[in-house]
């Protein structure tokens, strides 16, 4: 018995410990929810469609180069080794006998349900030109494609989920655009011109100015879509008589608004994309405009391949911005959408290289990981009246302190007006007349409950009316007194400033006149001063018979005026100039000429601006032509220009004239 009791006791202790650990783990999970939880990954699903042979194409009678193995795999001949085949595995493979309904029901229809959960989805048709992408997306009246089937089912789902009595109200809008030569054009409004692609603060891709048409039925969709489809750019090439020259994108938005509290709002987007096909211009024979269009198409598809490779390799930079197409597909590839890629291929052997390229791109694309999440938020206009009602619960003094200065200037009702009743004060529905009737009825019932409970707990509303009026009057008197004090303070400050200005004028009589009363005079250009060497000045001063006046005073232009009347520009003018006597200049020139005719190469290098090479040139010229007759003959020496001659004279003539040693040593 004792053993059984101890066993039961141990079991109870273990159970309690297990429960405690479980509850602790639960609390830990609850505390981290929303902060560390990431949306589950969703891989890009890839389906391959093989179109049948087209009559009139080259090689239509040859056996196909692609063969399906089962519903998910296919094989194609290896061009490097004809004895082998290349095998590919995808999420779905649709052969030549597959119908439009098979492709839609097997790959596209399952993702439409995510739109009603506030998530994004996208369907892309990829492949070379003439492989059947547009037929897959649009189809024909007898065999409608993915776009009409998806819109028909989506509108049916929104009607069922948004019916009366259901918790959500749904609305659907559509936009249709094309990317033609790196320009985003609105097909619903062709006159709008090139549009820009933006990204909001939450990372959502949007196009400002893009037309949005509300649709409630498939007839509404056809009324907008069919005329817009005729605006898409198409052209004829050797391989395709109606080749798409642009990427077409149909954007369908599903907005959901909750009818009851907490009044959530969801938005789901569906991208239906018909990509233009890659082209080999050697086979299509494109020239002129067609060649330019083909270059833009191939460039954007090349960037699309770079984006897929960057996502698969985990590179830090994904080149979404290198092309308008990849910028628009940022949600679809590596973003927040459930994506389906339908790769269209052709069976003819002339399309072999294009088919291999499309299959390789599809194989890389199925490795891309997206992280879809629900785009959900609360309606902002529901929270506004509640905040207003909290201010209204306060009395006039408290409310006045709670309001900012801007609200005080805009103003509220007159303070002396009769206060409203308690039910009007507590009502948060004073500005909700434009709301949904069902939502308004629900909030009215909540308002009545709030009014019945709030009248018991609001101390200000229980205050007698006479006391409130006296209190409001006191507050007004204090406000008026504050305004009077502010006005008086401003007057005193103005008087103090005026007194300081007068004191400055009295203590500074020599102050310059204000700029508005000064007359501006342009200073005359200063005369150049010729500077004499100091050694020469001393020699001339020491000579008793010196009659050379080095400095000649030109005299004052006018007598100095008083300091008050003298302008700064006039003070700056100097009336002295320096001149050199012509005898000194002639003496210096003669010394230079003697040195040129009699000096050796070493002596010539003692002159300024004369180096070893020029000294040798001067000696050689002197031996051939004889002595120099004047200093200017130095310009005749080969290698000495006129400018060099001028700089030579300026550098040497004054020093030599002053008696510096320049003769042969």
From Swiss-Prot:
InterPro entries: Hlx-hairpin-Hlx_DNA-bd_motif, Kinesin-like_fam, Kinesin_motor_CS, Kinesin_motor_dom, Kinesin_motor_dom_sf, P-loop_NTPase, RuvA_2-like. ATP binds at residues 127-134. Transmembrane segments: none annotated. Signal peptide: none annotated. Residues 43-368 form the Kinesin motor domain. Its main location: nucleus. Keywords: ATP-binding, Coiled coil, Cytoplasm, Cytoskeleton, DNA-binding, Isopeptide bond, Microtubule, Motor protein, Nucleotide-binding, Nucleus, Phosphoprotein, Ubl conjugation. Residues 412-424 have a biased composition (Low complexity). Kinesin family member that is involved in spindle formation and the movements of chromosomes during mitosis and meiosis. Binds to microtubules and to DNA. Plays a role in congression of laterally attached chromosomes in NDC80-depleted cells. PANTHER family: CHROMOSOME-ASSOCIATED KINESIN KIF4A-RELATED, KINESIN-LIKE PROTEIN. This is Kinesin-like protein KIF22. It comes from Pongo abelii (Sumatran orangutan). The lineage of its organism: Eukaryota, Metazoa, Chordata, Craniata, Vertebrata. The gene is KIF22.
